[in-house]
């Protein structure tokens, strides 16, 4: 099993990152470099979280082995008469190798590759790719130029901060500049910035995640919040549609002014490809390609203005598409919550859906998750499950807050994480150590990463599921992950006293902390900021518990969901009305589809079968009778008189009623139903088809 656990986790984490990226990104529409860069950033960060428990168990085993090697083994001396025979007692090794043991020399190389690759991504490559993806240039050179200009200030800020650390080290006479110390300064600067963001996000997640599960057990609360989201999303949806209309109007003007032989026509064609299909068709119909451009007669937009317009088109189209998909998802969620509220009082104990699922369900799932099981889960078991999970997560949050405030105390050990790990270390229970480390890091990561997935900066950065996240937001999330994960793991090692700078013991460090270097170069960070700044998580948790941030945003005009607010009540009522309209609209659509399906099943097959039989097997009696009638009429009848001809012409000009089951619907009553044919004539049905089903 040597190294097998490491290989299995490397493969598993890759597919986990790929699955999450597929949920939020779009592999078909987004650029391959964006997908690869984001996947690599997420993959490396998840690797740190999953592999660190193996590093901890391996380090504990190496410490035990080192302590056993330094201790002198007892010897049994047997003296008989004049001859003294010294027989050493058999050495009993008190340590046993863990199942996930990683050989020496592998972990330091692994951590160096993972850490420095992630730092290269977050500080150099991903910011450049972010500006490149957001650029509206029409060529690779133009996009690279724009990205370099936008990142000049960005990179200059980093150089300024790093230069300040260099000056501090150079002025300090006790320190001598070496490559390892310069490397430590860079790592300290990156971890300081990451720890600053980490505490802010952690303080929010420690309270909000348990509270969200507790509120998840309240059906009325979730339904009201969904109505509130519907009202806000409808406003955003209308704003996105209006913004798209304005941008498309500008594109139409540019498209009409720049003709086919203009030098900038290729740029306009590139912009048109980014527009929705219906707008492309409208602009194509209104385009007159036979007019030559006259540079002296008209004023044409410059290439710089087209670049700006291209950027606006990309953003507006993405935002419009995202709001449309989110609106459909929110409707399904609202309909589901309303169904749960109705089924709670059901006496049959069977869950009944108002609308059928748009996606066909698996037969295996339908067999086990039948309406009865669904009713017991949704109406009885799920609320209690959410409450239990909320209590467990609240206990974890209290343990984290207590440990963050007391992890610097070594005598006595007050950090609960350190107490649990040290108890397991005495018995060398490696399975328990790895499980405890993984659950602790996983909970901290969930609190931080879930906040990253939830934050929303003025619609500029937003992670949306169902493949609706744009390239800029994906790259920005990769940058945040790479900046937050290393300080998160260092903070966890400090909570468990596996970091020698916290425990103040001369013990073998983990391979992860060994690549970070000694923080004694920057004592004010190692002994000050790293220890006392995490205590602010208490203040942030209190502020989150009392929703101080939500109240401040509400006062600034950004409506947030608050139960005791008049604005919230108004938005809830508005959202409820919107959901009711959409529900009524969908019901009418389903009723129309059901009516058409019933007419088609009742009359469509009979008509097809009778028509097929009539054409393939004609009745001989009918054919003989028709031939006889034709011969008799042609033989004994002369030309019709004027009265009969007039009556026949009137009958021919009259509109026959169309009783076709496929076309006799509510839609056929509309003036543009498609029944009118070019030339001013309507479709009519022959007498054989009309009376066929009688």
From Swiss-Prot:
Keywords associated with the record: Cell membrane, Coiled coil, Glycoprotein, Membrane, Phosphoprotein, Transmembrane, Transmembrane helix
Organism (species): Mus musculus
Comp. bias regions, Basic and acidic residues: 588-624
Positions carrying Phosphoserine: 633
Domain of life according to the entry: Eukaryota
Sequence ranges on the Cytoplasmic membrane side: 22-32, 127-150, 208-387, 454-473, 543-694
Record field: transmembrane: 4-21, 33-53, 106-126, 151-171, 187-207, 388-408, 433-453, 474-494, 522-542
Protein name: G-protein coupled receptor-associated protein LMBRD2
Lineage: Eukaryota, Metazoa, Chordata, Craniata, Vertebrata
Topology within the bilayer: Multi-pass membrane protein
């Amino acid at each position: 099993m040597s190294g097998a656990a490491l290989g299995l986790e490397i493969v598993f984490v890759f597919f986990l990152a790929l699955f999450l990226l597929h949920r939020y990104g779009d592999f078909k529409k987004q650029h391959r470099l964006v997908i690869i860069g984001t996947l690599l950033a997420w993959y490396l960060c998840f690797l740190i979280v999953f592999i660190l428990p193996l590093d901890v168990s391996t380090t504990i085993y190496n410490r035990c082995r080192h302590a056993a090697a330094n201790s002198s083994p007892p010897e049994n001396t047997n003296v008989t008469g004049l001859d003294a025979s010294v027989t050493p007692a058999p050495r009993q090794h008190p340590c046993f190798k863990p199942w996930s043991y990683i050989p020496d020399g592998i972990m330091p190389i692994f951590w160096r590759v993972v850490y420095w690759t992630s730092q290269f991504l977050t500080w150099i490559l991903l910011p450049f790719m972010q500006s490149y993806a957001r650029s509206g240039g029409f060529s690779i050179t133009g996009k690279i130029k724009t990205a370099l200009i936008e990142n000049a200030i960005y990179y200059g800020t980093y150089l300024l901060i790093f230069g300040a650390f260099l000056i501090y080290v150079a002025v300090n006479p006790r320190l001598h500049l070496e490559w390892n110390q310069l490397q430590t300064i860079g790592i300290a600067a990156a971890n300081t910035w990451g720890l600053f963001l980490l505490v802010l996000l952690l303080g929010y997640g420690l309270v909000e995640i348990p509270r969200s599960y507790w509120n998840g057990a309240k059906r009325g609360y979730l339904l009201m919040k969904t109505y509130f989201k519907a009202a806000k999303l409808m406003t955003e949806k209308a704003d996105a549609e209006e913004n798209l209309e304005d941008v498309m109007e500008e594109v139409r003007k540019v498209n009409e002014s720049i003709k086919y032989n203009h030098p900038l026509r290729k740029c306009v064609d590139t912009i048109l490809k980014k527009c929705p299909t219906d707008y492309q068709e409208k602009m194509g119909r209104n385009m007159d390609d036979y007019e030559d451009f006259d540079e002296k007669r008209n004023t044409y937009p410059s290439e710089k203005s087209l670049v700006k317009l291209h950027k606006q088109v990309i953003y507006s189209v993405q935002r419009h598409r995202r709001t449309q998909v989110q609106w459909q998802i929110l409707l399904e969620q609202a309909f589901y919550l309303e169904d749960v509220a109705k089924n709670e009082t059901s006496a049959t104990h069977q869950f009944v859906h108002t609308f059928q699922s748009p996606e066909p369900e698996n037969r295996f799932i339908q067999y086990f998750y039948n309406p009865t099981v669904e009713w017991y889960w949704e109406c009885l078991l799920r609320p209690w499950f959410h409450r239990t999970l909320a209590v467990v997560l609240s206990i974890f949050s209290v343990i984290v807050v207590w440990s963050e405030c007391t992890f610097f105390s070594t005598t006595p050990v007050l950090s609960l994480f350190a107490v649990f790990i040290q108890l397991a270390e005495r018995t060398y229970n490696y399975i328990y150590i790895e499980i405890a480390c993984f659950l602790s890091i996983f909970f901290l990561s969930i609190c931080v990463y879930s906040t990253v997935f939830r934050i929303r900066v003025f619609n500029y950065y937003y992670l949306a599921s169902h493949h609706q996240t744009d390239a800029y937001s994906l790259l920005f999330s990769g940058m945040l992950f790479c900046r937050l994960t290393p300080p998160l793991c260092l903070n966890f090692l400090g909570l468990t006293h596996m970091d020698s700078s916290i425990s103040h013991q001369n013990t073998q460090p983990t391979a992860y902390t060994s690549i970070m270097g000694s923080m004694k170069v920057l004592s004010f960070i190692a002994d000050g900021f790293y220890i006392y700044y995490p205590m602010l998580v208490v203040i942030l948790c209190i502020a989150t518990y009392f929703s101080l941030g939500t109240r401040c945003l509400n006062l600034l005009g950004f409506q947030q969901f608050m139960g005791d607010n008049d604005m919230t009540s108004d938005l809830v009522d508005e959202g409820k009305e919107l959901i009711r309209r959409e529900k009524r609209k969908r019901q009418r659509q389903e009723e129309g589809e059901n009516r058409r399906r019933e007419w088609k099943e009742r009359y469509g097959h009979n008509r097809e079968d009778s028509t097929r039989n009539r054409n393939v097997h004609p009745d001989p009696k009918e054919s003989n009778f028709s031939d006889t009638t034709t011969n008799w009429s042609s033989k004994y009848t002369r030309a019709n008189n004027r009265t009969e001809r007039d009556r026949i012409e009137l009958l021919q000009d009259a509109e026959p009623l169309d009783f076709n089951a496929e076309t006799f619907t509510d839609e056929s009553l509309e003036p543009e139903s498609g029944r009118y044919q070019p030339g001013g004539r309507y479709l009519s049905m022959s007498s054989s088809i009309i009376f066929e089903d009688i």
